[in-house]
Structure formats: C-alpha cells, structure tokens
C-alpha cells in the first residue's frame, strides 16, 4: 500500500525534525558547558588546596580545630629514615630539588628525630610512648598561631594545653599538618614542651607521625604522592 504525504504534512514533519535536532544540539552543548564548568571548578578547588598545602593562604581561611582531627594511633617515621626505608623519598627529593639525597637525609634526620615512637589520641587524652614507657594527659585547645617562614610561605600551629595528667607529659603540644581548618589529618608534625612561645620558634625539629597501621612501604608511597 502506497501512502501519499500531502504538502502540509511534509512541512509539519520537516519542522518537527528540525526542532528535534535543535533540542539534541542544545542538550549536547549544555552538557559540554556543564562538564567544562565542572572541570574548571574541580581544578580551581584542587589548586586552592595545593596553595594551602604549600603555605599560601589568607588569614580568614584559618579556622579553629579540635583534637578530633588527630584522633587515632600514630607512629613516628624516624625509625624508617634510620633503617633506610625512606631512601626512595630522599632520592626523589634530590631528583627534583637542589640538594643531594645525602643532604636531604641529614635535613630530615634533624627534623624527624625523636624518642617518642608512638602517640595515641582519644578524645581529650594524648598518650606518648617511649618504648615501653608511656605518659598520658588531657588537653584543651589553646588557640592557634600563624607563622611566616624564611622563604615567604606560612604555616599554622594548632595549640593544646595540658589540664591534668602525668608529670612526664608535656605542658603544650602544637600540631602542624598543612591544613588550616577542620579536617581529619593523614599525618602531622608535632612540637611539644613547657614553653608555648619557645615552641613557636622551633623550626628545625618537627617529629612526624603517620597512622600506626601503615607499613614503611605504604608511608613511602604516601610521601611520594606529595
């Protein structure tokens, strides 16, 4: 059976086809713009986080933090530097930096050096382990300080003061983990002692801690990722 399409019908069919094509093109363009906008937003957010990590931020970006951000069991990375586990990290720094692997190793030896090999943080309590010996105390927030370093970038120390506990536990502890607002830490540098102001001047020794459930090789992978 042969069907004849009249001129008005042909005109209507052509109009519908053009309308459908326009809608498809418009949707495709909108999706392209949306994807491009998402990529731009993602890159901008990543860039902003990278700036903060490298020490470039505005004062009003800094927000108070609680011990909850560092809760958990942590291990010192110093033994891994001593036994050579971190040698690939030093080699990578030498490849991209201005010192030899040996020079970087000496720099990090001074920075990581500590006899506190493990720290456990739970609620307000912090326990410091030196081998089989431990010292435990409760801490409350004592604000934060923004520091400017020699090369022009900055860092934030989040400070906590002891309220009670063992005499061997430090009076003040200061966290630095490249974050400047509430965020769960994946590692941190810790400063401790009896003099709040004096600790702020300490920039050569910064014992560094990673989660206790990570192996040395996993810590190397984490460090190389940064």
Question: Which functions belong to the PLM regions below?
Answer:
Residues 2-6, 15-16, 22-100, 176, ...:
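Amphipathic/hydrophobic helical signal segments and adjacent flexible N-terminal regions
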Residues 105-173:
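Contiguous, well-ordered beta-strand patches that form the walls/edges
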